[in-house]
Amino acid sequence: MKRDMYKMFAECLVFTLAIAFLLGFAVACSDSDGKDVAGGSSVDAGVAAITDKNIAGVVQKGPFVKGSNIVLEETSADGSFEPTGKEFFATTRSDKGDFQIDDINLESQFVRLTATGYYKRETTGENTVCQISLRALSDISNRDQININILTHLEYDRALYLVKNGKTFAEAKKQARKEWMEQFGYKNLADDFENLDIANGGKADKALEQISAHFDECMFGEYCGTICAYEINNDCKSVQASIDDLAKIFSTSGKLPSSIDSLKQHRLDDFFKCTYEWMGK
């Protein structure tokens, strides 16, 4: 009798432990699905695959000319935001910078986009002598339009830095937007940069147009009486480096140095003088 009782107790204990293990496993899986963390990055509600998605948009510094190249890169399903090597390609359809990418299938909803081409200058109406590349980082799970512009380019490095340091994607994008707009003197404009279009009349759209025009003058013009980025080395590499370096300097702290003095030794110091002057710094 005692042996039967011990046997029943042992069987009950094994059954209970098995149930506890399964419940613990289920909770762990639930937590992982709720917030996927990999490589130091933080994702809002897990990574979701994308099937048969179509994305349209416009590329604007000024508007990119017809035939400019667009590349959409898939990022890893592990939440690291690293490219997998899978890419989708398009070209702008007109001199308005419009593009469309169809039949997108991805293992993650988070994508990197790069647009490369000449653009119509905001200040002169002429096409640029140099091609430039602008980037954007986006979650396409609930959007079918992504616009690529100078603000998405500047936001890119900062948002990635924040994600890799524990922010969710949504938090990182929101913080990067806020920091950049405050840097430019716009404190109450919180629109997603991918939604902005210089052809539209909203307040944030107009802010993008003004910011883009100022950058055009510092990159190619004679806005502040110093040497523009193109003339520093008389080549196009300096033009691209000017906006890339600005984004990198901003990426870790969420602000630019308070004084141009700290950038005097920078290879593009005249570009920064121009930028700081119209920022009023």
Residue ranges, per PLM feature:
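Sec-dependent bacterial lipoprotein signal peptides
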Residues: 1-27
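Feature for extracytoplasmic/surface-facing segments of secreted or surface-associated proteins
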Residues: 29-281
